[in-house]
């Protein structure tokens, strides 16, 4: 009966610790009632992702401001990954945290940027970005 052949290229991006694979020369054959699909696989180089973490000193200062603004005890653990909401902060508390950070670091945060922070790490990264821009 009829035979069909096609060629295509498919690329899958790798996640951490996984391989990227490309499928090329995809072929489909039909022989009466049975059909089969075959393709060749080859490994692609993995893509690197660069992420930048805030300086530990900045994170520590942010933690201190958050602790002060929310009246938290020293026993209450605050890390870079801590979400303000997990500490019981509502939207008003978050505004007060931002105001405290602006005062502590001598910066001004745009409202849309301030609304995007939800964790200590995000706040510290934004502060470092603003300090870098201010130093230019």
From Swiss-Prot:
It is found in: Plastid, Chloroplast. The keyword Kinase does not apply. The keyword Transmembrane does not apply. Its main location: plastid. One of its GO terms (molecular function) is acyl carrier activity. GO terms for cellular component: chloroplast. SUPFAM superfamilies: ACP-like. Induction: By sucrose in the dark. Down-regulated by starvation. NCBIfam families: acyl_carrier. This is Acyl carrier protein 2, chloroplastic. It comes from Arabidopsis thaliana. The lineage of its organism: Eukaryota, Viridiplantae, Streptophyta, Embryophyta, Tracheophyta. The gene is ACP2.
